[in-house]
Structure formats: C-alpha cells, structure tokens
Amino acid sequence: MEVNILAFIATALLILVPTAFLLIIYVKTAK
C-alpha cells in the first residue's frame, strides 16, 4: 500500500505542478 500511495502522490504532483504552472501563466497573460 505504501508504494502505491507514494506512486499516486508522485503521479498527482507530476500532473498538478505543470497544470498549476500553466494556470499561473494564463492568469498573468489574461491580466
């Protein structure tokens, strides 16, 4: 279970970090 949880967290970070980065750029560009 621990390995699966770590893999899930790592995957979530890989998805959320670029998404958040793109959202920040979009907000700055929109303004």
From Swiss-Prot:
Keywords: Membrane, Photosynthesis, Photosystem II, Plastid, Reaction center, Transmembrane, Transmembrane helix
Transferase keyword on record: no
GO cellular component: photosystem II; plastid membrane; thylakoid membrane
Location relative to the cell: Plastid membrane
GO biological process, one term: photosynthesis, light reaction
Protein family per UniProt: Belongs to the PsbM family.
Job of this protein: One of the components of the core complex of photosystem II (PSII). PSII is a light-driven water:plastoquinone oxidoreductase that uses light energy to abstract electrons from H(2)O, generating O(2) and a proton gradient subsequently used for ATP formation. It consists of a core antenna complex that captures photons, and an electron transfer chain that converts photonic excitation into a charge separation. This subunit is found at the monomer-monomer interface.
Identification of the protein by name: Photosystem II reaction center protein M
